[in-house]
Amino acid sequence: MFQISNLLLAADFSSEVANNSAVGMIGSFIAAALLIVIPATAFLIFVSQKDSLNRTSTGRR
């Protein structure tokens, strides 16, 4: 582990590069949530509610 940290320090990464990378990663997570997770969740909730209504209405007949 010590050798890896020395290698990273010797590579002369700046904190600005690391900060920009972290901001980009967080932005990617937020974009993925907005584009994939939230619409998929909304769709699944809609379908499950619709199915629940269909099952309760057919059960009363």
From Swiss-Prot:
It is found in: Cellular thylakoid membrane. Its main location: membrane. The chain crosses the membrane at residues 26-46. GO terms for cellular component: photosystem II; plasma membrane-derived thylakoid membrane. It comes from the Bacteria. One of its GO terms (biological process) is photosynthesis. HAMAP family: PSII_PsbX_2. Involved in the binding and/or turnover of quinones at the Q(B) site of Photosystem II. Belongs to the PsbX family. Type 2 subfamily. This is Photosystem II reaction center X protein. It comes from Prochlorococcus marinus (strain MIT 9312). The lineage of its organism: Bacteria, Bacillati, Cyanobacteriota, Cyanophyceae, Synechococcales. The gene is psbX.
